[in-house]
Amino acid sequence: MRAFSLIIRLGTRHLPWLGGLYQAQRLSRSRSLCQAQGFSRLALSLALLSLVALNLVALPAQAEIRVVDDHGEALTLAAPAKRIVALAPHLVEDAFAAGAGAQLVGVIAGSDYPAAARELPRVGSYRGIALEAVVSAQPDLVLAWGSGTPDDLVRQLQALGIPVYRSEPRRLADIAGNLRDIGLLSGHPAAGERAAARFERALLESRQQLTPAPRVFYQLGQAPLTTLAGGQIVTRVIQHCGGEPLFADAPVLVPEIGWEALLLARPQVIVAAAKDDAWQAFWAGHEALPAVASGTLYSLDPDAVSRPGPRLAQAARQMCADLADAAARLASSSPSEGQGQ
């Protein structure tokens, strides 16, 4: 009898139509017609059990979620992640854009966009990330930055059975891929797809070709003077906007540039990630450089251009507008420079 009641309770909870059968079975006990037909409690219980089993077998199993991260590693989740730790500001932005902001339980210092990210618990900073802080957040998914998250930390998390997705976008298209992947992993594939499509559409609208392509120096540091070499997302943005990024073939990612090399490169445009134009005072008195002589120095939103996330489309739009302006000014001020000589 207990087994029969348990079957009915389980059945009516998960399969509503069993409730009706159960009521019918109860009524049958008081009717002689059922007795005449020879239905016993055991027979009905077995029938109900068979129906439950058949329906449970028929229920579709939830499909595994499988993606390949930017390091070429396959990541498989049995179910969408519910507790996510993001170890880079751009990954926090990705998560919010892909609909997973509410599932973030830990982020890295400097994660300030959108505004809701400022209220999330910190598990570390660019100076270091404590394994204990990440683990204590009880994540079922960690979003790591390929070149920014220590490899040792990634291996330790994986050894503990915590899935790690590593983001390392080197091309603009990789950012859209990250948005789609995070949407899938967090159970928001539609939101991830929408975010990726918005990003791709914005890039398509801003893309331009300039003939000749202006020579662009991206100033990263001032003392010493440094830039970013090829393979960095900023150089991709410059190319996307029709410019020629100088020193893109340097053998290191952050090359130090001497004055002689810069004079030989003759940059026609200088851009830097800065909140204002104060950095441009550094170039006063260097009119031997075409960019300084023509005044084609531009400031870019530092967060938008340095974080390979959804707001990079905004930085690309700004960069493209600046390079188009520079090309027009160069063409009108100096025919030789306008021709890229």
Give the positions of each predicted feature.
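Short helices/loops that flank or line small-molecule/ion binding pockets
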Residues: 131-138, 160, 256-266
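A short, structured surface patch at a secondary-structure boundary
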Residues: 82-137, 141-147, 246
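Extracytoplasmic substrate-binding proteins
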Residues: 64-67, 73-74, 140-141, 145, ...
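Short helix-initiation/N-cap motifs at beta->coil->alpha
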Residues: 70-72, 123-132, 148, 250-259
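Bacterial N-terminal signal peptides
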Residues: 43-58
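Alpha-helical, coiled-coil/dimerization segments enriched in small aliphatic residues
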Residues: 110-113, 227-253
